[in-house]
């Protein structure tokens, strides 16, 4: 399965979440670290859903950048 993740930069670190997996979040000091942490968080989240016999959502979210004149 593939899931889109959203990475946001904040003061001193990065955070990320998965729109298709509510509650699945991660942080890291660098963009690479938060991406690695998010990968582990997704695996753990999906495993937890499976262990609890809950449905595992499919990845539907996508992202696109829009250019605007400021």
Which residues does each predicted region cover?
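A short, exposed loop/beta-hairpin motif centered on an aromatic-Gly-Thr core
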Residues: 22-32
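Short, charged, surface-exposed hinge/linker loops at domain edges
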Residues: 1-3, 36-70
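Short aromatic-glycine-(Arg/Gly/Cys) micro-motifs in beta-strand/loop hairpins
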Residues: 7-21
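Hydrophobic residues in alpha-helical membrane-spanning segments
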Residues: 20-23, 58
